């Protein structure tokens, strides 16, 4: 009988925090600067430089901990993780091993069978990011950019509670939403502000002890994470089926090839010779500080969904999609505040917005158009200044450039023609030029009138009022 295997998965999720300055110095965290321009003696590890903790990093870490039901460590410290690598100018990383800021939390996820499952969070700790090595353009050397060195991170370490790729994605989506709602990070995997390392092992179904785990790196999308989990599961099962042993190691996933390769043996904590950082004072979290952070907690998704049902009266499906992104929820509320038309705003977000997002493979966090301009577009439609096809045409431009739709209509001459005399003359010409369609309609073929409406709209360059065209056609026929 073939053996059945269970997958056991734990995650280490690194989140780049949305502070303006780095964790231990005043250098900018802005993305995209010239190499080595956002640096100073502290974040490049110069002798004699002393770090000072950015208070906002601590506040963000505590806020995430509270939102994930963690215990907050009231007295904590930083530790040095010692290793040598060119992107690590100090030859150690300041992190937290012994007294992480948050412990023993968890989040509820929805499972594929419609139930819920709690995924435990072992700890959340603060640490600094390393620099960035650039290998691609040179064969005999690598370059290093220290702009990222010292950028603040939190690492969220889960318990090994996940059993499938679907559970992993549900957990990551839940974490991402919580952190985005807090404003602690934009959590964009493709830009590296959220990164997940997957620790995975397999064991025979029913076995209590864990198998040997590997750590999968270079995962920058949910699709890559799913493929990496499925690929690594199969690789480990094949090894066990052939009588071999899985090696504890770190592996790099190559998404283009759909396979992983070994990078190095997997280290344990003792390999890094951790010790308390002597340059940083202990962290003391007072009751007053905790109260202040709790008081700033936003309205999270569950509460927002309940409010939308009573306040806006839009369908549950729309509510689920809109609140699934903080940016889209903010966009919805800001637009409704201007035009007071929740159903129409929801229709634009659920219709054209989702269509274009799918077409362009975009996240909701990347939407560029403003609430003001979406409100103007809705007003133009309501005032029958433009017809629905022109409105969609304008929205496509607005989706890319956030143009002012009122100005665009004036500049492009897109205002709807509702002059009955002009419409009647055009309809008469269309009737004269399409005798077969006229005969078909008079013989009971209702679809023929749709063709005649289309021909009229074409003649009017899309600027006619379709309802008036339809009315005039029926009158003349």
Residue ranges and their predicted role:
Residues 64, 232, 335, 348, ...:
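Amphipathic alpha-helical segments in well-ordered regions
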Residues 191-204, 309-331, 342-360, 372-374, ...:
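Core structural elements
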Residues 168, 319, 345, 391, ...:
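Small-residue helix-packing motif on alpha-helices
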Residues 3, 313, 336-345, 383-386, ...:
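Structural motif
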């Amino acid at each position: 009988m073939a053996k059945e295997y269970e997958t056991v998965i734990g995650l280490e999720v690194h989140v780049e925090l949305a502070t303006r300055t780095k964790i231990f110095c005043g250098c900018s965290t802005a993305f995209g600067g010239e190499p080595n321009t956002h640096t100073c003696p502290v974040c490049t590890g110069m002798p004699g430089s002393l770090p000072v903790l950015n208070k906002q990093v601590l506040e963000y870490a505590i806020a995430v901990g509270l939102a994930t039901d963690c215990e907050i460590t009231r007295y904590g410290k930083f530790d040095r993780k010692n290793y040598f690598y060119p992107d690590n100018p100090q030859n150690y990383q300041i992190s937290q091993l012994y007294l992480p800021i948050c412990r023993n939390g968890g989040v509820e996820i929805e499972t594929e069978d419609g139930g819920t499952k709690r995924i435990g969070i072992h700890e959340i700790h603060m640490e600094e990011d390393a620099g960035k090595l650039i290998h691609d353009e040179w064969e005999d050397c690598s370059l290093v950019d220290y702009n990222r060195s010292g950028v603040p991170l939190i690492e969220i370490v889960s318990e090994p509670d996940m059993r499938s790729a679907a559970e992993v994605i549900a957990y990551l989506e839940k974490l991402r939403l919580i952190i985005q709602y807090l404003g602690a990070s934009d959590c964009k995997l493709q830009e590296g502000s959220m990164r997940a390392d997957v620790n995975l092992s397999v064991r025979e179904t029913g076995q209590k002890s864990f198998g040997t785990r590997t750590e999968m790196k270079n995962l920058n999308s949910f699709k890559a994470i799913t493929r990496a989990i499925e690929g690594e599961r199969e690789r480990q099962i094949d090894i066990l089926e052939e009588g071999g042993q899985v090696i504890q190691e770190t592996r790099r996933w190559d998404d283009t090839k759909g396979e992983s390769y070994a990078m190095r043996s997997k280290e344990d904590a003792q390999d890094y010779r951790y010790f308390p950082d002597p340059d940083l004072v202990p962290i003391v979290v007072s009751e007053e500080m905790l109260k202040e952070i709790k008081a700033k907690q936003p309205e999270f998704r569950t509460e927002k969904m309940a409010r939308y049902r009573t306040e806006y009266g839009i369908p549950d499906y729309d509510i689920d999609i809109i609140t699934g992104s903080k940016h889209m929820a903010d966009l919805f509320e800001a637009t409704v505040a201007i035009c007071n038309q929740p159903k129409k705003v929801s229709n634009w977000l659920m219709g054209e917005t989702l269509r274009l997002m799918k077409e362009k493979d975009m996240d909701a966090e990347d939407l560029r158009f403003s609430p003001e301009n979406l409100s103007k577009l809705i007003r133009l439609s309501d005032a029958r200044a433009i017809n629905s096809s022109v409105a969609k045409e304008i929205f496509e431009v607005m989706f890319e450039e956030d143009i002012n739709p009122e100005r665009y209509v004036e500049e492009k001459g897109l205002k709807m023609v509702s002059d009955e005399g002009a419409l009647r003359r055009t309809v008469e010409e269309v009737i004269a030029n399409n005798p077969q369609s006229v005969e078909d309609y008079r013989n009971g073929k209702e679809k023929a009138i749709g063709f005649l409406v289309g021909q009229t709209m074409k003649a009017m360059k899309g600027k006619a009022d379709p309802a008036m065209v339809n009315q005039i056609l029926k009158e003349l026929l």
